[in-house]
Amino acid sequence: MTMSSFLINSNYIEPKFPPCEEYTQHSGSAGSSASYHPHHPHPHAPPPPPPPPPPHLHAAHPGPALPEYFPRPRREPGYQAPAAPPGPPGPPPEALYPAQAPSYPQAPYSYSSAGSAAPGPEQPPPGASPPPPPPAKGHPGPAQPLLPGHALQRRCEAAPAAGAGTGPGCALLPDKSLPGLKGKEPVVYPWMKKIHVSTVNPNYSGGEPKRSRTAYTRQQVLELEKEFHFNRYLTRRRRIEIAHTLCLSERQVKIWFQNRRMKWKKDHKLPNTKMRSSNQPSLGQQQAKAQTQGHPRPLDGAAPNAAAL
């Protein structure tokens, strides 16, 4: 508010500059710019002193004066060149300020027009902004290498335009053109497969075993032996716990305990329950017979004496 009121009430001379339209004209712009002189005092005369601010401005707005606005009239006349005989007209503004055209679209045109002297019809005028360059078919510049997947996709996209007979060719292209992608898949060899056969195959040649034998480590055998020392039979819950602890399957733990029980019976010379014949007496019958032989039945005459006692 203070600045606007100061500019209105003071006798400040606004410097005048030539309009901007004169710089864009093709003819007569240099002469007009050279002969144009704003209405300023004579350059040889001393610059007029700055007018004092009106008294009512200080009364209305008390405060420090703005010194940055007073030296401007002193500097403005300094921009005017001293009086000199008019020289030859300078170059037109177009030579000093050429139209700035982007440099990146010139590369494709320079490549395509290298063989011919006259530029092609695709070259834009110097004043207008050039459109984006179309993709050149015979561009000799270095092209970025395409991945196999992108090249295959472009071939298959161009196949329907050529004809319907190229459809099966695109279906067979991935197997031939992408060998690197298949190498990333895990390779499973025949010796890595496990074959579980429940029935006997008469045509089996014996090239591959039916089931590989489990090789237990010392730590696994030690833990299994400790468990067998306390319990010769395992519940399913305990079997699952041992299998998870020793990194084995439930079937491996079950088979190990079966084999270990058979060995224990053989060491203790106990009859095998699976191979036992029907004519042999059971273990319970043998124990009952031994008890009857150790304690004979009392006689008939001794019964009254025993009762009397």
Swiss-Prot record:
Location within or outside the cell: Nucleus
Database matches in PROSITE patterns: ANTENNAPEDIA, HOMEOBOX_1, HOMEOBOX_2
Motif extent (Antp-type hexapeptide): 188-193
Function field: Sequence-specific transcription factor which is part of a developmental regulatory system that provides cells with specific positional identities on the anterior-posterior axis. Binds to sites in the 5'-flanking sequence of its coding region with various affinities. The consensus sequences of the high and low affinity binding sites are 5'-TAATGA[CG]-3' and 5'-CTAATTTT-3'.
Listed GO CC annotations: nuclear body; nucleoplasm
Signal peptide segment: none
Protein name: Homeobox protein Hox-A4
Region of interest (Disordered), residue spans: 17-148, 267-309
Keywords: Developmental protein, DNA-binding, Homeobox, Nucleus, Transcription, Transcription regulation
Biased composition (Low complexity): 26-36, 96-120
Cited PANTHER family: HOMEOBOX PROTEIN HOX-A4, HOMEOTIC PROTEIN DEFORMED
Domain notes: The proline stretch works as a part of the transcriptional activation domain.
Family: Belongs to the Antp homeobox family. Deformed subfamily.
Ranges of compositional bias, category Pro residues: 44-56, 83-95, 121-145
